[in-house]
């Protein structure tokens, strides 16, 4: 799969090697620093350090300069294999390396890499020598905190991030993209457009949607429900908590407890807030008996779930502790599986298209070594998923052994306006929960059979999808999603009566419109203000418009449409909303 870095690629090796060069530079400049780990990552590299003194962004230029000096030596990267005992002796003054070495078995191969005046515990691979790295093709980009081994109980280290490319041109292109990503950061735009907030004193990873953001969310959810009804789904509502016995039966307490919030003791029972909706949907299924004639059931829920994510992993609305999944479970018979999978795929493509996403990537994950379920069911399910992708002409990669232990899956990823991939839809077979909860239906031959269950999410989570939309559009939402679609700006109080007439007409037609009759701000200042708020249309009303009974429209991109009749202007906006146009 694409996010798995290609260890043999030249760029991977360069990024791994430059991380070692950075560590050497840091040790030369700050001699008492302790080193932890420094891997290559997507778009770059990082290294974690335990500094004696606090370092700042200003120190990065100094480190970069020292790195370039080291690169000029052209020193080779030389691999050596040593014993565990030798490794413990070699790194006796490096506590984080010692921690890693102690965790290795005595029989494990331990390799080190030497380069210039630096030696690191490392599996590689690396470039042959430093001459392979263009000294103008890298940049240190940021400093962050990172707990050792990702555990909040451990010491907070200093992580220095960098990026490296094959040449200076590629580096400049990446840095330009990075600036655009910063400009579109949903956390930044969330503040500027008054969309949402997070309150650390109330709880990290818990999202508060403000009126503007809540309006957009409501539009998304209303559209979601409407389309699900059209596609033969029933919508469910289930509780937010459940007794521990439910999570024991589902297996969550055995396999997922670390990601669950702590139990709550009430009425001599233990309760947990739900990390997933599946067991609740199964509980509804198991309230009665079902015949093959009843199948399939397509049950969907905008269900809020809670997962204990580490604080360091939280990120705006993208990675949170409480979020609303657009969850659905399809419960069907063997002979219905293929058509149901195909319909889910079609539905996913349609939904994305409505929100302005046309490019996608698909990944088919197959059976891992440890798995539950019948061998024939696995083979059939993988075949069905693959055939559905082929039938709909969806290109895909196969992730061999990448499926969950309980079933194969398709992961679908959209590509946003900045070329980034986002995991969105999942179509996942489950051979585990139907067995655990003893789900049955009466087949045509009168025998009790186990139904097939398909987990399915289209948007992933509402909060995360919201953040993706903000960044995809840079906050300039398509007209149908804009919290405020039209602002009326009268040039003076004389024309206010006509402005109120327009306001009433458009409001009655369901257009989200407001009147700004504040006399203390100049018109040009108002126009700039509403452009910065990314309101699609500004109706500028002067005495000429009153006399002629017309409207002049200015868009947020400064385009001008003059002299529209009232009904023409109304139809213009209505069509933009109906067709889900950007502007």
Swiss-Prot record:
Transmembrane segments: none annotated. It catalyses: tRNA(Thr) + L-threonine + ATP = L-threonyl-tRNA(Thr) + AMP + diphosphate + H(+). Pfam families: HGTP_anticodon, tRNA-synt_2b, tRNA_SAD. The keyword 4Fe-4S does not apply. One of its GO terms (cellular component) is cytoplasm. GO terms for biological process: threonyl-tRNA aminoacylation. Its main location: cytoplasm. Its EC number is 6.1.1.3. Its cofactor is Zn(2+). Disulfide bonds: none annotated. Catalyzes the attachment of threonine to tRNA(Thr) in a two-step reaction: L-threonine is first activated by ATP to form Thr-AMP and then transferred to the acceptor end of tRNA(Thr). Also edits incorrectly charged L-seryl-tRNA(Thr). PANTHER family: THREONINE--TRNA LIGASE, CHLOROPLASTIC_MITOCHONDRIAL 2 (PTHR11451:SF44), THREONINE-TRNA LIGASE (PTHR11451). HAMAP family: Thr_tRNA_synth. NCBIfam families: thrS. This is Threonine--tRNA ligase. The gene is thrS.
């Amino acid at each position: 799969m694409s996010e798995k870095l290609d260890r043999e690629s030249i760029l991977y090796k360069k990024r791994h090697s430059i991380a070692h060069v950075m560590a050497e530079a840091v040790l030369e400049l700050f001699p008492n620093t302790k080193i932890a780990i420094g891997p290559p990552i997507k778009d770059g590299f990082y290294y974690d350090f335990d500094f004696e003194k606090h370092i700042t962004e200003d120190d990065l230029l100094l480190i970069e300069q020292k790195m370039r000096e080291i690169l000029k030596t052209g020193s080779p990267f030389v691999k050596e294999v040593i014993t565990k005992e030798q490794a413990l002796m070699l790194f006796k003054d490096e506590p984080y390396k010692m921690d890693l070495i102690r965790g290795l078995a005595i029989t494990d191969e331990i390799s080190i890499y030497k380069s210039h005046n630096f030696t690191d515990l490392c599996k590689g691979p690396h470039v042959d020598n430093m001459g392979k790295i263009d000294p103008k093709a890298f940049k240190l980009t940021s400093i962050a905190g990172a707990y050792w081994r990702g555990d909040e109980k451990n010491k907070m280290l200093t992580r220095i991030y960098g990026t490296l490319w094959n040449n200076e041109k590629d580096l400049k292109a990446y840095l330009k993209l990075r600036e655009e990503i910063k400009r579109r950061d949903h956390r930044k735009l969330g503040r500027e457009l008054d969309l949402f907030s997070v309150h650390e004193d109330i709880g990290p990873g818990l999202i508060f949607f403000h009126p503007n953001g809540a309006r957009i969310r409501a539009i998304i959810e209303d559209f979601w429900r409407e389309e699900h009804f059209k596609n033969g789904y029933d919508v469910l509502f289930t509780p937010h908590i459940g007794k521990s016995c439910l999570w024991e039966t589902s297996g969550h307490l055995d396999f997922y407890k670390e990601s669950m919030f702590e139990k709550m003791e009430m009425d001599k029972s233990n309760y947990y807030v739900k990390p997933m909706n599946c067991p609740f949907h199964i509980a509804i299924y198991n309230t009665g008996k079902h015949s093959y004639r009843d199948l399939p059931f397509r049950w969907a829920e905008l269900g809020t779930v809670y997962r204990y994510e580490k604080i360091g992993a939280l990120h705006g609305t993208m990675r949170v502790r409480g979020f609303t999944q657009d969850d659905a479970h399809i419960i069907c018979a063997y002979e219905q599986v293929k058509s149901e999978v195909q319909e889910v795929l079609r539905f996913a493509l349609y939904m994305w298209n409505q929100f302005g996403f046309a490019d996608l990537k698909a990944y088919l994950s197959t059976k891992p070594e440890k798995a539950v379920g019948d061998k024939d069911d696995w083979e059939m399910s993988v075949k069905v998923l693959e055939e559905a992708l082929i039938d709909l002409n969806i290109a895909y990669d196969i992730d061999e052994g990448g499926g969950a232990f309980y079933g194969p899956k398709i992961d679908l990823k959209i590509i946003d306006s900045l070329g980034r991939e986002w995991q969105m839809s999942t179509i996942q077979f489950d051979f585990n929960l139907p067995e655990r909860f003893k789900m049955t239906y009466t087949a045509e031959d009168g025998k009790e059979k186990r139904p097939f269950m398909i987990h399915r999410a289209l948007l992933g989570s509402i909060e995360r999808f919201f953040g993706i939309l903000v960044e995809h559009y840079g906050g300039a939402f398509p007209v149908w999603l804009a919290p405020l679609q039209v602002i009326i700006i009268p040039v003076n109080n004389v024309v206010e009566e006509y402005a109120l007439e327009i306001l009433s007409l458009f409001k009655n037609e369901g257009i989200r419109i407001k009147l700004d009759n504040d006399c203390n701000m100049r018109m040009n200042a108002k126009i700039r203000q509403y452009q910065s708020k990314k309101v699609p249309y500004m109706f500028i009303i002067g005495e000429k418009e009153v006399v002629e009974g017309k409207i002049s429209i200015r868009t947020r991109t400064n385009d001008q449409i003059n002299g529209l009749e009232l009904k023409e202007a109304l139809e213009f906006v209505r069509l933009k909303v109906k067709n889900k146009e950007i502007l």
